[in-house]
Amino acid sequence: MAHEVDLESFKELERDIILRVLYRDQTVQSTEEERVRKLKSHLQHLRWKGAKSSSQEYKEKCCARCQRALGLLLNRGAVCQGCSHRVCSECRVFLRRTRAWKCTVCFEDRNVKIKTGEWFFEERARKFPTAGRRETAGAKLLQSYQRLSKISVVPPTPPPFSESQCSSSSRLQELGHFRGFNKSVENLFLSVTTQMRKLSKSQNDMTSEKHLLAMDPRQCVGHTERRSQSDTAVNVTSRKASTPDILKAFHQEDPKHPPDPVLKQDTPPSSPTHSAVFSGGLRHGSLISINSTCTEMGNFDNANVTGEIEFAIHYCVKSCSLEICIKTCKNLAYGEEKKRKCNPYVKTYLLPDRSSQGKRKTRVQKNTLDPTFEETLKYQVDPGQLMTRRLQVSVWHLGTLARRVFLGEVILPLAMWDFKDSTAQNARWYPLRAKAEKYEENIPQNNGELAVRAKLVLPAGPRKPQEAQEGQLALNGQLCLVVLGAKNLPVRSDGTLNSFVKGCLTLPNQQKLRVKSPVLKKQACPQWKHSFVFNGVSSSQLRQSTLELTVWDQAIFGMNDRLLGEARLGSKGGAAGCPDSGSQSKLQWHRVLSSPNLWTDMTLVLH
């Protein structure tokens, strides 16, 4: 806030300096006003020059600036892009930067705005149209109403109404509170419905290409298929919301186009060494769905599980791919018992990976209890991970409004499967079973691989043990660990992770040295290349120590981080629930300690 300056409170010298500055400022302002006045007068003169007089006669075609006559073929003039007037060639000004031209009036008007600074006020008024306006009482009321509508939607429960405890005025006030609460709830429902419609519309616009390969690989027809992903995402949201109005508004969004749950990308046939089961029919490397977690969260219906499924399993060592040939099903249960309807399809997972990236699906067969698929689903799996994976083959019914019904499943531990046996590649019948509550805990789970490099750094000229005092040698060692990257991690539904690595070295005296890597966001196969350094350790201490490495997915909105997997090295190596990995981790730890000052590359299996 500006204050009035009293010159009498200053000394004479100070007063002279202030007055001198004020006079100079007044002179500068007057000079600037004179300069602006000359620029505007010159612009006005150009406009008057082009004005037509009633006392003179003009031809139909003439220059809008100098009033010269324009010809039919030569000197016809051109239309200015700024004012849309036709001007001759002498009344144009060419702009070098934009490689365009303007008439003299438009150019001078632009020049005046630049030199006087009027362009700044025009741009400010354009970006902030309400700036400088006087606030009215109506605007204040609207702002207060908007603030009230943003208050917490669910207020505390009001006390029970009692006539003896409140007068007529308190009744009216309480009634007003109830009306405000109902209004805020209506606003909440409207905003949630709008957001769900936007989500459904944006996801329905995604498309994927589907290429079909028949028996002859040369006959290939490619076409595009509309892809909808909104069914699963909104099913989860609608099940969580308990308001029927939200569900009604969403189901009315697009009832004519149910989403297609099958998204495939065909792959060429494999080598001729495969059995006839895998060489015939259509071959598919099924694409994953972005939102594939609704059925795994229990958002589905159950039917009486009956019937069998026929499929075959083959593993190609050259391409490191696991192929599941889905043949046919028989005697399935009805997905909708009242309508006597069944639209079955098959979905597979390689457990424990239940992410959308690890899901494969077949086409939907309409109105049949004995569907025939003849499709091959592929997974890229390293041979070392097969022993820790389980194949889950489940049959589902696609109902109206993308509602899923569980028809049965088969779970096969791949550790017990003989891939070298040729008879094991033949198609077999498996009875469908109900969904198990808990899977076997004694089967080790593979949650990916972590690539690291380790080195024990010892002094260049270590002293002899008899010359060194006890405990001094422990301060000379250094353990260096480089976390390179990870792969095959259980990703989120969108196929990404915000992952980081934690390291904990537990010494024999139960002292723990903890380190942490930076977070790599939105990467399914992160590559940290981050170094962990543990100082003040010796080889004798490390032989009795344990190094634990854990991979985490950073959560959002204050939630707890999700553990993706862990691996241990040292005397107590081996992850919990996986005793077979203990001997391998001890062997790798021994290699690091037995070769000091040398890097040792390791690939740790996360459990």
Swiss-Prot record:
Highest classification ranks of the organism: Eukaryota, Metazoa, Chordata, Craniata, Vertebrata
Pfam families: C2, FYVE_2
Gene Ontology biological process terms, A to Z: exocytosis; intracellular protein transport
Tissue/organ expression: Highly expressed in spleen and lung. Detected at lower levels in heart and testis.
Gene: Sytl3
Comp. bias intervals (Basic and acidic residues): 248-259
Function (record text): May act as Rab effector protein and play a role in vesicle trafficking. Binds phospholipids in the presence of calcium ions.
Places the protein is found: Endomembrane system
SMART domains per the UniProt record, alphabetical: C2
Keywords attached to this entry: Membrane, Repeat
Subunit structure of this chain's protein: Monomer. Binds NRXN1. Binds RAB27A that has been activated by GTP-binding via its N-terminus.
Residue ranges, annotated region (Disordered): 221-279
Naturally occurring in which organism (per UniProt): Mus musculus (Mouse)
GO function term, MF aspect, one: zinc ion binding
Primary localization: membrane
Polar residues composition-biased segments: 230-241
Protein name: Synaptotagmin-like protein 3
Gene3D superfamilies per UniProt: C2 domain, Zinc/RING finger domain, C3HC4 (zinc finger)
Residue ranges of every copy of the RabBD domain listed in the record: 4-123
